[in-house]
């Protein structure tokens, strides 16, 4: 049975469910910023993505170790995680999963994944993925976050979804691939951000083709904010090549900001797991750490 652990620092609180090691609340002075999982739109909050981000073609791939067969975004989000540490001051918590006979049927590699959530500032949550190769062959994988935030944000008064924008740290041009109807990624009909822009307005229609994926974002920083109030969230994701931005259908009142090291299979790729673009390869005994942080505005 899953349990929820709450960490605190001043007026900032975060709650994490051991099922999937998923963040389920992020509140400042009692004001909830994290999407609360209304199933009418999307029944999750902030799943962790491992050992894949997005989908494999037909949910399967071959590898040197055998067949990989798993659902969209991988296995970590759908299993119970062990609580291994809570800091003395109650401001951080670490969870762990390892491979099991069941996981090896879907992903035939040995691993350990530690997830640490830490409140590192008066309004900042830091999330760290630590992946260790516990096997004797190279471990291929991707990791990612999927936190979704309420739009409008707390304190936004009369703002609407259409009053929100994505702000970059400098002017920038980006061509973003889109998701095909069969769940693959393509540059055919890709989304192109306005040239030399540091602000991108969003509407519900921005997500008609699923997530928008930005590559090599300036400063590895992206801010989701209301144009009138300035309220929202800033995400810093150095070490993650991509940031996905997504909202659900039917005018869902949230936006997910998703740091990824990899992404769903491209329509031009083959079905060998190790060939997936930007897959991390970890030698036996090595550990890879990736961190992103969310600051509430």
Walk through the language-model features, giving the residues of each:
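Short, Gly/Pro- and small/polar-rich lid/capping loops
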Residues: 1-10
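Acidic/His-leaning functional-site neighborhoods
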Residues: 12, 73, 78-85, 197-277
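Acidic-aromatic substrate-binding/catalytic surfaces of carbohydrate-active enzymes
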Residues: 13-67
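Short Pro-Gly-centered flexible turn/kink motifs
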Residues: 16, 61-68, 129, 280-296
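Asparagine-centered strand-capping/turn motif at beta-strand->loop junctions
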Residues: 16, 129-135, 247
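Extended, loop-rich substrate-binding clefts of extracytoplasmic carbohydrate-active enzymes
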Residues: 67, 71-122
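Beta-strand-rich interaction surfaces with strong enrichment in secreted/lumenal proteins
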Residues: 114-116, 277-282
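Active-site/ligand-binding surface loops and adjacent short beta/alpha elements
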Residues: 148-237
């Amino acid at each position: 049975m899953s349990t929820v652990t709450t960490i605190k620092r001043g007026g900032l609180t975060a709650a994490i469910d051991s099922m999937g090691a998923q963040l389920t609340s992020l509140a400042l002075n009692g004001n909830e910023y994290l999407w609360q999982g209304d199933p009418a739109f999307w029944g999750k909050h902030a799943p962790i993505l491992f050992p894949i981000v997005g989908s494999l073609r037909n949910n399967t791939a071959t590898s040197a170790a055998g067949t990989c067969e798993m659902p969209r975004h991988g296995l970590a989000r759908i299993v119970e995680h062990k609580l291994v540490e809570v800091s003395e001051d109650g401001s951080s918590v670490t969870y762990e999963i390892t491979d099991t006979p069941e996981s090896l049927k879907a992903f035939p590699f040995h691993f350990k994944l530690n997830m640490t959530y830490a409140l590192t500032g008066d309004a900042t949550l830091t999330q760290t993925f630590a992946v260790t190769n516990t096997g004797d062959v190279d471990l291929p994988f991707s990791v990612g976050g999927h936190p979704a935030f309420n739009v409008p944000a707390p304190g936004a008064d009369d703002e609407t979804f259409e009053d929100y924008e994505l702000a970059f740290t400098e002017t920038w041009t980006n061509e973003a691939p889109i998701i095909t109807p069969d769940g693959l990624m393509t540059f055919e009909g890709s989304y192109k951000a306005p040239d030399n822009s540091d602000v991108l307005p969003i509407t519900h229609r921005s997500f008609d083709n699923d997530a928008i994926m930005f590559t090599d974002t300036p400063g590895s920083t992206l801010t989701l904010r209301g144009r009138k109030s300035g309220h929202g969230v800033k995400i810093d994701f150095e070490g993650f090549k991509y940031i996905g931005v997504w909202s659900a259908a039917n005018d869902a009142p949230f936006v997910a900001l998703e740091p990824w090291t990899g992404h769903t299979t491209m329509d031009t790729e083959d079905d060998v797991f190790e060939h997936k673009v930007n897959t991390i390869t970890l030698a036996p005994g090595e550990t890879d750490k990736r961190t992103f942080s969310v600051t509430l505005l």
